[in-house]
Amino acid sequence: MTTTNILRWTSIAVLAGLVTAEGSPSGGAQQGPTPADLENTDISYWLGWIWVAIIGSFIVYQVVFHFIRYVRTVACLSNETQRYFAAPSVMFGRFKKYFLDAPLFRTRHHREFKLSTAINVGTLPSRLQMAFLIGYFGTNVAFCVISINWSGTYKEVASEFRNRTGVLAVVNMIPLFLLAGRNNPFITFCGISFDTFNLIHRWFGRIVVLEAIAHSFAFIASKVHSTGWKSLAATIKHSDMIMWGVVGTASFVFILLHSPSAIRHAFYETFLHFHIAAVSLAVAAVWIHLKELPQLRIMYGVVSLWVFERTCRLILIIMRNVGSGGTKADVEVLPGDAVRVTIRMARPWKFRPGQHAYIYMPSVGLWTNHPFSLAWSDEEEDLSEEKGLAMNRQDILEMRKTSVSMIIRRRTGFTERLFKKADLSPAGKFTTSALIEGPYGGENLTSYGTVMLWAAGIGITHQVPHVRDIVASFANGTTATRRLTLVWIIQSPEHLEWIRSWMTTILSMPRRRDVLKILLFVTRPRSTKEIHSPSSSVQMFPGKPNVQALIDQEMQEGVGAACVSVCGTGGLADDVRRAVRMRETVWNVDFREESFSW
């Protein structure tokens, strides 16, 4: 069992234990639980079982979905028409069109709202995401107020409300921290993307902050009403519990204020360091605040999840990068403000399409690590005489040299420093020590008879591995895919250099012409002479594509069930989403959008 799988199962075991333990009374351990404490216990249980129900529903959906994909793949290996799988379920098609794949309003989902070219204020959630967020937010609001005796005295009502909001804030820290990790087990088990879980993590954080603020204001209101402001100041000064409660709430408010999209995107590395520091302070403050309360056991679980996830990440980094001379990175400048980074791995791994990894380059950014799509992988044997004859499994692994490559576009921060260092190096290349963490993600599209891959600019790095995998599987007879179309939109023909060597390899693969068609669209050609089509299966056009027309054509000529995947700008993703949704009730087509946000 791999380290990642061990982490996934252990995280689930910890969470299951917390669901049964989280409903502890909210105070007065020496005096026994009050009726209000028991109500808080019940509400904590209800919230925990809501998590279980939601997660269980998605897991069941994924099991059914993967079973259907498996049956479809086996049934279509020798089926050239696949007509049975081309027809959609009318009810499920409508569900996808109007809910599962639908943006919140009309067509805009992934295209960012911007105050200027440098200030991004975020995107709109999808209809399904918004329904979940509203439902969970509403559930927390309801749980904050139900069963409270609103007819009681001011002090009694404030005390009940204070305890209720405090308990809910602590309980909600469990999913908040679980969803923050890169090794979140539910990405795999629920089939929910890291991008969506990141969105949920941010909103769970806002809920925790609001409940912490409500908890603090309820205490302040009760104290001031009873004994006045001077007594409040004295209580904060002389009570460690209250003082650290104030520190915790202040830390939560700071996290809320420094986390808007505009700040995260403009100053990501600075944001990340401040975020970790503020979260650490908030957790320490809450820990001390709960020192004599039963809810401290929930903080044991919260901190354990965070420490365990970080420990497993460290173990994974050591396993991937220690030995055989360590991991090295070859960085090469490419036309169009980009670099190719080839990571020569200390230890091999099994590469799958759709994966990404985090890279650390101390010589470029000492404390930073960034995620990038893995565009290519090569594996070769080290046949040097120094290695000698392989005598055991470890010798065999050491003789296998794996390299993974990625294309990184020049932006700001780390990518800017990386590009400049390569550009100033002799021949536009340099080699440095590096660490790689991963791989994360991965997706298999070989159960679809028709696959259409859309990419804009650097988004091609996500789609190239799928092209290679499907063409190889087609030649081996291990895929249902009979029609594969790659649509790549670039600004200049010089961007073709990013993947030229890889595409040369793909175009020379057996039976490539029988399955693969490539459409290139150059939006800003310098002259018409730059636009030429090498063959009927690789065609180049000036300008932007008509997304709806190309997808409609694919529907007319496609085979069996289809998948349309897009990785690129927000505008392209929204256009492709709209075109696919227009056909989901008449064509068995699934939509896949690859994006990475923070």
Stretches found by the model and what they are:
Residues 25-50, 112-125, 147-164, 190-200, ...:
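Juxtamembrane membrane-interface segments at transmembrane-helix boundaries in membrane proteins
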Residues 56-60, 130-145, 164-182, 200-221, ...:
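Hydrophobic alpha-helical cores of multi-pass transmembrane domains in eukaryotic membrane proteins
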Residues 340-351, 355-452, 468, 523, ...:
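FAD-binding FR-type
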Residues 17-38, 85-121, 137-152, 180-189, ...:
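Membrane-proximal N-terminal segments immediately preceding the first transmembrane helix
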Residues 56-79, 178-186, 260-266, 307-325, ...:
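Transmembrane-helix exit/juxtamembrane "anchor" motif
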Residues 26-36, 280, 397-401, 406, ...:
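Reductase modules of NAD(P)H-dependent flavoproteins
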Residues 21-24, 30, 68-86, 148-159, ...:
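Interhelical loop segments of eukaryotic multi-pass membrane proteins
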Residues 264, 269, 273, 277-289, ...:
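Membrane-proximal cytosolic interface modules of multi-pass membrane proteins
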